[in-house]
Amino acid sequence: MLTGVTDGIFCCLLGAPPNAVGPLESVESSDGYTFVEVKPGRVLRVKHAGPAPAPTPPPPLSDAAQGDQSGLVRCQRRITVYRNGRLLVENLGRAPRADLLHGQNGSGEPPAALEVELADPAGSDGRSVPGSAGSGSGGRRRRARRPKRTIHIDCEKRITSCKGAQADVVLFFIHGVGGSLAIWKEQLDFFVRLGYEVVAPDLAGHGASSAPQVAAAYTFYALAEDMRAIFKRYAKKRNVLIGHSYGVSFCTFLAHEYPDLVHKVIMINGGGPTALEPSLCSVFNMPTCVLHCLSPCLAWSFLKAGFARQGAKEKQLLKEGNAFNVSSFVLRAMMSGQYWPEGDEVYHAELTVPVLLVHGMHDKFVPVEEDQRMAEILLLAFLKLIDEGSHMVMLECPETVNTLLHEFLLWEPEPSPKALPEPLPAPPEEKK
């Protein structure tokens, strides 16, 4: 932090632009954390852990040399946006849906076409209607509509199993509003033991990261640029993004910005595929001093809404996990800064990365219908419901969450019939 302030003073004296982003500077602490300066005066605490570096193995043969077609998926989709505010998503290829998890909730082949009414900024929820776009209510034929724009997606992706011993795999964990990287403790310990490299930052104003006293420091775009800087610093060839609540939006942003580097995404209680817009009538619009006085009530409300039970164990988890521990100023700025009009249904429908959706059925912040709608919009999505979990499901049910995440990391789609190797010819019979 002191280094950032000093650099800012020198920038002013030398006439350099104060917001110019230079090379990331970092300081290692004795307790295993790294403090990364993403911008002058803006320092994030990062937990970066992994196995000891192993001897470099010989480089593997290329896929063309091996003739390997495993994990190869053809992503074909047409997205049409109409002027009347409706969205038509047509899946033109075969998506690997039902071969992920045994006992998966809501598994099955995606509909050939999905018609969605885009959610308006006022907050009315869109309704998705699987089926043909030409069908109308009451047998009445609709008038031909002029499309506003059409997006064609046609690409091939290789989706492979991500194992802990592989040096090109990195897991990124991003928390939500009011939390810190401590909410991922069980997941970080679990995956480090399995040999994975993990990266978990504290958002600005959260945990041990710096907390600028300017509301503009907590807009979605400011926080997204922080996550971009962390991602570019630690990313390798195959990166997996795991987000919770508001953190899911940053995972979506990075997956959209870096489709070749993001291998898989896991969204935990992230909500529906709608653009972000702060609510005008919210308790978080009250003055900071009022929010400070209400902080005990807000913490109790979070305990009731974020946990399936409100016993001594949950209270301890809330305290130790820093699930809701943030200043009133940062909380108000975070809630009012959730403005991201680009992150609408079209933005999510363009993603071609496989996504695992995890939802705690007792969640009072995010209705299950929102995650179900997200699963409908995404091209490669798998929804898993945890009956005994709530919004903080990674704290309540760590073993279940760890198992689901690990299974998804190891999953790879079955090869298409065209990619299956031809059987070897039978050896000729010997003549007697």
From Swiss-Prot:
GO CC field: cytoplasm; mitochondrion
Where is the catalytic site?
Answer: 245, 363, 391
Kindly list the places in or outside the cell where this protein is found, as annotated in its UniProt entry.
Answer: Cytoplasm
Look up keyword Translocase and say if it applies.
no
Q: Where is the composition biased (Pro residues)?
A: 52-61
Its main localization is: cytoplasm
Q: Which branch of life, at top level?
A: Eukaryota
Q: Where is this region: Disordered?
A: 47-69, 121-149
Give the matching InterPro entries: AB_hydrolase_1, AB_hydrolase_fold, Epox_hydrolase-like
The alphabetical list of record keywords is: Cytoplasm, Hydrolase, Inflammatory response
The biased composition feature labelled Basic residues covers 139-149
Q: Does the keyword Hydrolase apply?
A: yes
Which molecular-function annotation in GO is an example for this chain? carboxylic ester hydrolase activity
Q: Please name one Pfam family that this protein belongs to.
A: Abhydrolase_1
Which EC number applies?
3.-.-.-
Residue intervals of the AB hydrolase-1 domain: 170-272
Q: What class of enzyme is it?
A: hydrolase
The alphabetized list of GO BP terms reads: lipid homeostasis; negative regulation of NLRP3 inflammasome complex assembly; phosphatidic acid biosynthetic process
Q: What family, per the record?
A: Belongs to the AB hydrolase superfamily.
Tell me, in a sentence or two, what this protein's role is.
Negatively regulates NLRP3-driven inflammation. Promotes NLRP3 degradation through the chaperone-mediated autophagy (CMA) pathway, hence attenuating inflammasome activation and IL1B secretion. Acts by recruiting palmitoyltransferase ZDHHC12 to NLRP3, facilitating NLRP3 palmitoylation and subsequent degradation.
State whether it acts alone or in a complex, and with which partners, per the record. Interacts with NLRP3 (via NACHT and LLR domains); this interaction is enhanced in the presence of NLRP3 inflammasome inducers, such as ATP, nigericin, silica, or alum. Interacts with ZDHHC12.
The name on file for this protein is Protein ABHD8
UniProt source species:
Bos taurus
Q: What is the lineage of its organism?
A: Eukaryota, Metazoa, Chordata, Craniata, Vertebrata
User: Which gene holds the coding sequence for this protein?
Assistant: ABHD8
